[in-house]
Amino acid sequence: MSRRHAAEKREVLPDPKFGNIVVTKFMNSVMYAGKKSVAERIVYGALDLIEAKTKQPPLGVFEQALDNVMPAIEVRSRRVGGATYQVPVEVRSTRRQALGIRWLITAARGRNEKTMTERLSAELLDASNNRGNAVKKREDVHKMAEANRAFSHYRW
């Protein structure tokens, strides 16, 4: 382990439109090369598209999508006597959120729609209905943890 002190948690301000900290974190993850205004346009555009398609509050759909994507357990490598075991461990809440956001954005970037706004809105809608690549990623992680349940006594 590192002997240095843990990095300080940075304060994340709520976004201007919804007043939600999670939306800001999502926006920051979408952002490339410090272009926050572009990321803002993409995220708000996607949420507006969702509202137009579903006639539901977009924040509710967004939170549902994120809940459906966040993993509860994952596997971590642990070396024991020359063998490396994949040990299932619970995911702490901050990491759950970070992974969920990351998987949603990665899945959206891999889609075939024309603009990033359309891709993101489609992936969020899919994830809120328990479909899509981001949900598949979560299922794969859970399946991997379930398959390696025999090694759970190696947890630390």
Swiss-Prot record:
GO terms for biological process: translation. Keywords: Ribonucleoprotein, Ribosomal protein, RNA-binding, rRNA-binding, tRNA-binding. One of its GO terms (molecular function) is rRNA binding. PROSITE patterns: RIBOSOMAL_S7 (PS00052). The keyword Ribonucleoprotein applies. Pfam families: Ribosomal_S7. SUPFAM superfamilies: Ribosomal protein S7. CDD domains: uS7_Bacteria (cd14869). InterPro entries: Ribosomal_uS7, Ribosomal_uS7_bac/org-type, Ribosomal_uS7_CS, Ribosomal_uS7_dom, Ribosomal_uS7_dom_sf. GO terms for cellular component: small ribosomal subunit. Part of the 30S ribosomal subunit. Contacts proteins S9 and S11. One of the primary rRNA binding proteins, it binds directly to 16S rRNA where it nucleates assembly of the head domain of the 30S subunit. Is located at the subunit interface close to the decoding center, probably blocks exit of the E-site tRNA. Belongs to the universal ribosomal protein uS7 family. PANTHER family: RIBOSOMAL PROTEIN S7. This is Small ribosomal subunit protein uS7. It comes from Rhodopseudomonas palustris (strain BisB5). The gene is rpsG.
